[in-house]
Amino acid sequence: MKNPEAQQDVSVSQGFRMLFYTMKPSETSFQTLEEVPDYVKKATPFFISLMLLELVVSWILKGKPPGRLDDALTSISAGVLSRLPSLFFRSIELTSYIYIWENYRLFNLPWDSPWTWYSAFLGVDFGYYWFHRMAHEVNIMWAGHQTHHSSEDYNLSTALRQSVLQIYTSWIFYSPLALFIPPSVYAVHLQFNLLYQFWIHTEVINNLGPLELILNTPSHHRVHHGRNRYCIDKNYAGVLIIWDKIFGTFEAENEKVVYGLTHPINTFEPIKVQFHHLFSIWTTFWATPGFFNKFSVIFKGPGWGPGKPRLGLSEEIPEVTGKEVPFSSSSSQLLKIYTVVQFALMLAFYEETFADTAALSQVTLLLRVCFIILTLTSIGFLLDQRPKAAIMETLRCLMFLMLYRFGHLKPLVPSLSSAFEIVFSICIAFWGVRSMKQLTSHPWK
């Protein structure tokens, strides 16, 4: 029998306690995997609430927002892309875990025991530490994780900048738990470990006193996101910072942190944000002579090269001055307003798609996913001021009208159905004219 809580909304108290990992074992222990709520999905309104609170606090304390609009849109875009595969497949982190549990478990810990709950808490957090560390020390794993580090801002939207690829290696580090921790208990802590890490992506919280000794905090995680030399490969913790202190990877925040990749990618285009390092590995692999050197390109650190230590040379990491200017869009304010409106519409269709997944045909589901990806890519092109941005936006608006006409996209407000068609027809005409100018003369700026 399914637990009613799996279908119910969480209270305000539960929502914030989910984010701070303070839910009690008695209210988060379930006998079967099917009973486990989708805590990440239920946390969405609390993500939004904290992001708005961060905005207000930042204005009060610093007189400015906590980040830039174009960077925030790119971070949320990455989060959207990372969740799209779950529309078609069950998470590999769960699938692999269930397989090991059903075929190779050594013994069963009771699912309703607080000791099992706390053991899973420690086990998942320990597994996360080692996954996270390897995601920085193994180049092919860094190809996925670098997405999260590509933001040059550090705020709550940065927490949403997730990788499409990362999940395909992270499951390995949690697999040993399947020898004795029931899948339902694991699924709870896998979500809570992720949710906890949302609120630590902020600059509006300074030092948390004694909690800094035990927990991963905004201060500790700011160091992890820094590209200063003293920040590189430090503070891998998920929840407990003690792992870094035990294994020698801890570093306290002691100077202004400059965020982002050591070699910034300077784009807001989400596909490039996700996959650019894979192309870099591919190019380096073929340019590097020798079988063992090629092997090392894939499995040693991102900074490795022939004749260098496994993790590369720290002196090759570019120095920072603290005066670095983050990459920003040169688009007009009017264009930014347009992208925000289109992004908001896409999010509405995205949420509706997840809510109605069971009722949608595979064709409709696939077309919606294609539209979402095209929308995110087109917005990235517009913010980057790419030469072919107008052409892509024309095609995107045309696709919207076609999906709308053939019933693959529902009107968000039925009474405004005609208005939507008129607005998108105008957009097609506008961007179509821009496209013709691009094709016949110079790129539009």
From Swiss-Prot:
Record's subcellular location: Endoplasmic reticulum membrane
Span(s) of short sequence motif Histidine box-2: 145-149
Effect ascribed to mutating H132A: Loss of function
Domain Fatty acid hydroxylase stretches: 120-249
Organism superkingdom: Eukaryota
Keyword Translocase: no
Keyword Hydrolase: no
Catalysed conversion reaction: 1-O-(1,2-saturated-alkyl)-sn-glycerol + (6R)-L-erythro-5,6,7,8-tetrahydrobiopterin + O2 = a 1-(1-hydroxyalkyl)-sn-glycerol + (6R)-L-erythro-6,7-dihydrobiopterin + H2O
TM ranges: 43-63, 111-131, 334-354, 363-383, 413-433
Name recorded for this polypeptide: Alkylglycerol monooxygenase
Organism: Homo sapiens
